[in-house]
Amino acid sequence: MKQLLDFLPLIIFFAVYKFFDIYIASGALIAATALQLVVTYALYKKLEKMHLITFAMVTVFGTLTLVFHDDAFIKWKVTIIYALFALALGVSQLLNKSILKSMLGKEMKVADNIWAHVTWYWVSFFAICGLVNIYVAFRLPLETWVNFKVFGLTALTLINTVITVFYLYKHLPEDQRKELK
């Protein structure tokens, strides 16, 4: 259920874009992201920082898109969010306070150097996705960017999540690997 809630704003954005335009879709994205927060809080009685940051970014850049009637703002949102994720992960790792380890370390007991590898992998992933988004957003047609944002970045994120899980699994202590089988 929680994963479906995470994809709800993206699905609504895509559907509204296909039937209307980027401006109505941007407004729908703001509303859907707000709805996502309300439903998530109602069901789980807490909100993750990532959801709050995403909501703030969607609201700011979506509103700018609507006010100035310029789709560049909603396009930049993707790159800025990815840059913030990369920056947060990188800084946390440099301070030896890995965000990924704090999120998953209780369930997956792997060495600190493995968490560092995973963290830098995701820093690189987010940075590359942000740069590719700039290219696709400002060099290719709007329709291509919407498809890239909805399907391309989602698929790449899922693939990288699977790669990360396999990498972490490979480095789990043997007794913990047996528990997961």
UniProtKB/Swiss-Prot annotation:
Keywords: Cell inner membrane, Cell membrane, Membrane, Transmembrane, Transmembrane helix. InterPro entries: YciB. Pfam families: IspA (PF04279). It is a multi-pass membrane protein. It is found in: Cell inner membrane. The chain crosses the membrane at residues 10-30, 50-70, 72-92, 118-138, 148-168. Its main location: membrane. GO terms for cellular component: plasma membrane. NCBIfam families: ispZ, PRK00259.1-2, PRK00259.1-3. Belongs to the YciB family. Plays a role in cell envelope biogenesis, maintenance of cell envelope integrity and membrane homeostasis. This is Inner membrane-spanning protein YciB. It comes from Shewanella sp. (strain MR-7).
